[in-house]
Design a protein with these regions (language model features):
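Short, well-formed alpha-helical segments that are part of the catalytic scaffolds
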Residues: 13-26
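A conserved acidic beta->alpha catalytic loop
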Residues: 23, 38-48, 67, 90, ...
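Short aromatic/hydrophobic "clamp" motif used to bind/position activated sugar donors
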Residues: 86
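Flexible acidic/His/Gly-enriched loops in nucleotide-sugar-dependent glycosyltransferase catalytic domains
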Residues: 100-167
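Conserved nucleotide-sugar donor-binding catalytic segment
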Residues: 139-219
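Catalytic core of nucleotide-sugar-dependent glycosyltransferases
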Residues: 201-209, 214-242, 265-278
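Membrane-interface aromatic/basic loop that binds lipid-linked glycans or pyrophosphate carriers
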Residues: 260-311
Length: 311
């Protein structure tokens, strides 16, 4: 029975989209539609996708958009999806054979579940890493959302989860954010969607560490404030403000680490101060202390080096 709408946002993905579609071929029996949102591409993304889908006998529909934003592109498709289940995957990732059917099977075994999360594998610089298994989730919505925001459970890669269209309802991805929009979307869904997990790997998630870090270096303060504004809107789901402050600290620490690694110690120090002020688990307290020490050492070294040069 064709019960799944597959949603793929794509921007200049001509080089990868055929591979992503090919990875879905084994799931054709349960796929009712593939909604490809061609988001302001300047290459042949749509044409390549249409040719591949025709060859693979996948029911592709291309939606043209000018969102220039992955969250906005997904939102367009969510508004047009027709099937009872939604599966989202990015245009440069790969689905693993049997993954989608396994997610559906778990939803049949646990009929109350409206969100099913599977394992995934990260691939960085051509190297496969260990499978990331979902852990720590409970049947309680707010507890799952809070633990997710606080980094106490495994994060969900887009492409490793199946969600009922009924549970999604009018929920949409926040737009115009440089990062973490998927976290806010999953957290909002978890508040009301009973969740189940499977340990079977569902997809391979391709990660560019450099591209991920670049998001934190462009207009870092402006982007952080925009993201924090979207984060704080989760209070309308019943999530505690202390949980949102913890998330602020986690993201601020990540930004501080990126700027430290790239030699921008002043920006690193500013974001480290935000992280230090947020509620933390012991491991994050230690990370903050470690980076404070490293910053102090590097700054002292820089001052000493400057004095030697001017002598």
């Amino acid at each position: 029975m064709k019960t799944v709408s597959v949603i793929i946002p794509a921007h200049n993905a001509a080089a990868t989209i055929a591979g992503t579609l090919a990875s879905l071929r084994s799931e054709a029996a349960v796929i009712g539609e593939v909604l490809l949102v061609d988001d302001a591409s300047s290459d042949d993304t749509a044409a390549v996708a249409e040719e591949a889908a025709s060859r693979l006998a996948l029911p592709l529909r291309v939606i043209a958009s000018n969102c220039r934003d992955a969250g906005g592109a997904r939102n367009l498709a969510l508004a047009q999806a027709d099937c009872p289940w939604i599966y989202m995957i990015d245009a440069d990732d790969l689905h693993l054979e049997g993954g989608l059917r396994s997610l559906l099977s778990r939803s049949d075994a646990q009929p109350r579940a409206e969100m099913v999360v599977g394992a995934f594998r990260r691939r960085t610089k051509g190297e496969h890493h260990q499978f990331k298994l979902p852990y720590g989730y409970t049947v309680t919505g707010i507890a799952n959302a809070s633990a997710y925001l606080e980094g106490q459970v495994r994060s969900i890669a887009v492409g490793s989860a199946l969600v009922s269209r009924r549970a999604i309802g009018e929920t949409r991805f926040p737009t115009a954010l440089a990062y973490d929009e998927d976290t806010l979307f999953w957290a909002r869904l978890m508040c009301r969607a009973p969740l189940a997990v499977i340990t079977q790997p569902v997809m391979t998630y391709f990660v560019s560490a450099e591209r991920s870090d670049d998001r934190f270096t462009i207009k870092p303060a402006q982007r952080f404030l925009a993201w924090r504004h979207a984060l704080r809107q989760l209070t309308d789901c019943g999530i505690a403000k202390s949980t949102l402050k913890t998330r602020e600290g986690l993201v601020a620490l990540k930004i501080a680490r990126v700027h430290y690694a790239r030699g921008d110690f002043d920006t690193a120090a500013r974001f480290l101060a935000v992280a230090k002020a947020a509620p933390k688990v012991p491991s994050d307290i230690w990370r903050c202390m470690r980076y404070q020490l490293k910053l102090a050492v590097r700054r002292r070294f820089s001052i000493s080096h400057a004095l030697l040069q001017s002598a």
